[in-house]
């Protein structure tokens, strides 16, 4: 990959601590920080604004989930600082990322903070926005296609569909350390609402059990997707009652997105029993 970058965990921390002391020098006066959504991985799903800002940046501070294909859109001369996290592995703590963005912005640099998906959906973009703007640095959000949309488009099915799903909810399946999953199970257990569950692989058995206990059909279709829209994409189909066991038999690379709902049976490669399509609803859906 072209450009100046650092890849291992210890070096990531060092790169972040070094802040604006690298080769790129800031312009006179205040810089700016843009929190940019990289989308699910396919570079063609970047917005035009995201692409323009990446090409105009002095430095790109990027997450682990940004694909190599998207990173290749960054000009070779632009400095890159990796600050990615993985489950249980945070070489650069969030507070340090916030401080780095402030330091770079105060140095007069044009900073692209590049995040997988959309920075406003489970991306901690709000925390970074608050830190940057509190320091008086101009900052904007640049939306990206979130993982749920990327998965749906890649597998060729809708997230809502007349007669099948009248709503969509984005939910985190991740729990804080030693804490319970703090979810409103009763409101989530609505078969007419598609659930997009992020970061839930480790807790999917509990999630499925609680949804079923609160009234969600046990045979509701579920699609698990890893690295949606990229050449490395992997999918797994199951029912709600079977998804945890299916994932144990065939683990997918993290992070895994789960689409729970009748629309999941409309995915192009779904081999679930035909009765799960609820044909009486599909007649209504296709009107």
UniProtKB/Swiss-Prot annotation:
Pfam families per UniProt: TP_methylase (PF00590)
Compositional bias segments (type: Polar residues): 1-10
This protein's pathway: Porphyrin-containing compound metabolism; siroheme biosynthesis; precorrin-2 from uroporphyrinogen III: step 1/1
EC number of this enzyme: 2.1.1.107
Binding site for S-adenosyl-L-methionine: 40, 116-118, 146, 199
Family label: Belongs to the precorrin methyltransferase family.
Functional description taken from the UniProt entry: Inactivation of uroporphyrinogen-III methyltransferase results in the loss of nitrite and nitric oxide reductase activities, but not of nitrous oxide reductase activity. Likely involved in heme D1 biosynthesis.
NCBIfam families in alphabetical order: cobA_cysG_Cterm (TIGR01469), PRK06136.1 (NF004790)
Name of the protein described by the UniProt record: Uroporphyrinogen-III C-methyltransferase
Organism: Paracoccus denitrificans (strain Pd 1222)
Gene name of the record: nirE
């Amino acid at each position: 990959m072209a450009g100046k970058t650092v890849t291992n965990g210890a070096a990531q921390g060092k790169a972040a601590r070094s802040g604006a002391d690298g080769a790129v020098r800031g312009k006179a006066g205040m810089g700016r920080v843009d929190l940019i959504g990289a989308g699910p991985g396919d570079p063609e799903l970047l917005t035009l604004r995201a692409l323009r800002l990446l090409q105009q940046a002095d430095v790109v501070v990027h997450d682990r989930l940004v694909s190599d294909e998207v990173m290749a859109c960054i000009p070779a001369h632009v400095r890159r600082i990796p600050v990615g996290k993985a489950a249980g592995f945070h070489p650069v703590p969030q507070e340090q990322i916030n401080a780095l963005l402030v330091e770079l912005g105060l140095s007069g640099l044009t900073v692209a903070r590049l995040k997988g998906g959309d920075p406003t959906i489970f991306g901690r973009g709000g925390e970074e926005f608050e830190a940057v703007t509190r320091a008086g640095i101009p900052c904007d959000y640049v939306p990206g296609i979130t993982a749920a949309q990327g998965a749906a488009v890649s597998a060729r099915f809708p997230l809502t569909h007349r007669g099948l799903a009248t709503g969509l909810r984005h939910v985190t399946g991740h729990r804080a350390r030693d804490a319970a999953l703090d979810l409103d199970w009763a409101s989530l257990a609505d078969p007419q609402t598609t659930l997009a569950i992020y970061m839930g692989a480790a807790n999917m058995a509990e999630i499925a059990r609680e949804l079923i206990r609160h009234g969600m059909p046990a045979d509701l279709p579920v699609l698990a997707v890893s690295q949606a829209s990229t050449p490395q994409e992997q999918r797994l189909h199951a029912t709600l009652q079977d998804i945890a066991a299916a994932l144990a038999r065939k683990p997918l690379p993290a992070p895994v997105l789960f689409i729970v709902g009748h629309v999941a049976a409309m995915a192009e490669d779904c081999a679930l029993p035909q009765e799960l399509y609820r044909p009486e609803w599909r007649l209504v859906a296709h009107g």
